[in-house]
């Protein structure tokens, strides 16, 4: 999450590509001389082609796509000054806000999100990622 998603969009990237959606458990297919350490968002077992293993990129796609919609723009967010907390905020075309936060601390951290008119608090478990989406206050 840190390098692939939040780190890139926080540095003005307009999109994130997860190149390999599905590979087998030998990280194939691949080309000679190609990446030997790349993996798919999901791996499928080449013994039965039914068993699926969800890797970290699967969860990155799930978190972001659940709240950040096509055409969204990243907006400013400020607050938490903990080096083990990373987050990004977005405004979706339908006017909703999206917020994705990674807590890389061992312990739960209490956060408060505010859009300027209302706020809510949440306890973010240690070593977790949380995604939020809410309608703008009128």
Question: Where do the language-model regions lie?
Answer:
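Substrate-binding and catalytic surfaces of secreted/luminal carbohydrate-active proteins
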Residues: 1-138
């Amino acid at each position: 999450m840190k390098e692939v998603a939040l780190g890139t969009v926080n540095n003005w990237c307009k999109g994130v590509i997860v190149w390999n959606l599905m590979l087998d458990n030998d990280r194939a297919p691949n080309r000679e001389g190609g990446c030997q350490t790349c993996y798919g968002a999901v791996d499928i077992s080449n013994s039965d082609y039914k068993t699926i293993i969800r890797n970290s990129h699967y969860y990155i796609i799930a978190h972001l796509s659940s709240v950040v919609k096509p055409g969204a723009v990243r907006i400013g967010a400020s607050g938490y000054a903990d080096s083990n907390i990373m987050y990004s905020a977005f405004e979706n075309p339908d006017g909703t806000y999206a917020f994705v936060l990674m807590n890389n601390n061992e312990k739960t951290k209490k956060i408060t999100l505010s859009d300027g008119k209302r706020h809510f608090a949440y306890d973010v478990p240690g070593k977790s990622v949380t995604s939020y989406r809410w309608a703008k206050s009128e």
